[in-house]
Amino acid sequence: MKKVFIRTFGCQMNEYDSDKMLAVLAEEHGGIEQVTQADEADIILFNTCSVREKAQEKVFSDLGRVRPLKEKNPGLIIGVAGCVASQEGENIIKRAPYVDVVFGPQTLHRLPKMIVDKETSGLSQVDISFPEIEKFDHLPPARVEGGAAFVSIMEGCSKYCSFCVVPYTRGEEFSRPLNDVLTEIANLAQQGVKEINLLGQNVNAYRGEMDDGEICDFATLLRIVHEIPGIERMRFTTSHPREFTDSIIECYRDLPKLVSHLHLPIQSGSDRVLSAMKRGYTALEYKSIIRKLRAIRPDLCLSSDFIVGFPGETEREFEQTLKLVKDIAFDLSFVFIYSPRPGTPAANLPDDTPHEEKVRRLEALNEVIEAETARINQTMVGTVQRCLVEGISKKDPDQLQARTANNRVVNFTGTPDMINQMIDLEITEAYTFSLRGKVVEA
């Protein structure tokens, strides 16, 4: 049985893609063993992300660490996948000729054939094309071990924000046909999955073709998934404010399985910065969406992404972001210091903000967000929350870990048969990033 080591960087789309890489290899070889140490593997894969600073150099650093394994065992297969693979392509082979296969997010289904071609020809294989929906046509049925699962409904992005590489590494937006998505979810439900997380770079741009040739939009998809037997909770990530329509907002009124948590990236509270980012909305328009959502779902918890130190961002503009965070009461959000991505328009903008100032802004924003997170957690003490038990607690092996509808981790004392089940927990203690609870006896 082939032993596979895979290291995944970046977003949930990459996590999903890594699972699919393992699935296609398992189908090809009649099963595989996933190992946690690279030196135990027959196949080593790095599924890369190009969002963070110096992503390319980190990949080559990782490759350098496994080079001695290749020298010791020439039959070892080393592969680079993901967005850095899409950006760098043949350059990876030039810099690291011991790499065997390089493939992008849209060609991971071709991985087994690429390995065979490498072993047959002796030549490294590179495939970073964008064959669109073909990828999903060639993936094996989903197999899961858990109560929650991701389902990719679309890929790519056509927004071309000035700082972002996604359109260049994952291609333009394309949606899976409606029936393909529903079949995968129904299959997961039959395997005991209770929570579905619909996945895409911009899920609310979903436009899936139906059998009759008509187009299903994202709000309609949510309503259909809501009725699939066995599915008890629905999430989605990530969405874009530009296409967060009233029909999607109304789903929060009508669909009780849709959780009271939304991740809706805004990036900045300054209209000038938003314009320079080419985000396509103003801070006021974003606030209008949130106002409508909270009018029909008052308990909605909102998380977001923020970039500080974008080229030209002034202290006043940063203060506008700080005020927006306080006004909307964001929690559980992600704050990043801007770093230029090669090939993006923003990379050409003059950046005169000292790094020390960017760090100060990062810390100031995180302080406000963490305070709000702690406040919300404290309000949950004494309440009973319906939770999905995910497994053994990461903090204490004698405890279990569950997740609330509003995306809080709850550690509690329970029994193994509770794993992957929905249970009621009374929240007894609150911390900044987690909760403690106890089982509510029936």
Swiss-Prot record:
NCBIfam families: miaB-methiolase, MiaB/RimO family radical SAM methylthiotransferase
Record-annotated Radical SAM core domain positions: 143-375
Similarity annotation: Belongs to the methylthiotransferase family. MiaB subfamily.
Keyword 4Fe-4S in annotation: yes
Assembly with partners or alone: Monomer.
Bridged cysteine pairs (disulfide): none
Record-level GO cellular component terms: cytosol
Example GO BP: tRNA methylthiolation
Cofactor: [4Fe-4S] cluster
HAMAP family in UniProt: tRNA_metthiotr_MiaB
Any Pfam family hit: Radical_SAM
E.C. code: 2.8.4.3
Domain TRAM: 378-441
Binding site for [4Fe-4S] cluster 1: C11, C49, C83
Record function comment: Catalyzes the methylthiolation of N6-(dimethylallyl)adenosine (i(6)A), leading to the formation of 2-methylthio-N6-(dimethylallyl)adenosine (ms(2)i(6)A) at position 37 in tRNAs that read codons beginning with uridine.
Co-factor: note: Binds 2 [4Fe-4S] clusters. One cluster is coordinated with 3 cysteines and an exchangeable S-adenosyl-L-methionine.
Protein name from the UniProt record: tRNA-2-methylthio-N(6)-dimethylallyladenosine synthase
Subcellular localization: Cytoplasm
Keyword line: 4Fe-4S, Cytoplasm, Iron, Iron-sulfur, Metal-binding, S-adenosyl-L-methionine, Transferase, tRNA processing
Domain MTTase N-terminal as annotated: residue spans: 2-120
PANTHER family: CDK5 REGULATORY SUBUNIT-ASSOCIATED PROTEIN 1 (PTHR43020), MITOCHONDRIAL TRNA METHYLTHIOTRANSFERASE CDK5RAP1 (PTHR43020:SF2)
Catalytic activity: N(6)-dimethylallyladenosine(37) in tRNA + (sulfur carrier)-SH + AH2 + 2 S-adenosyl-L-methionine = 2-methylsulfanyl-N(6)-dimethylallyladenosine(37) in tRNA + (sulfur carrier)-H + 5'-deoxyadenosine + L-methionine + A + S-adenosyl-L-homocysteine + 2 H(+)
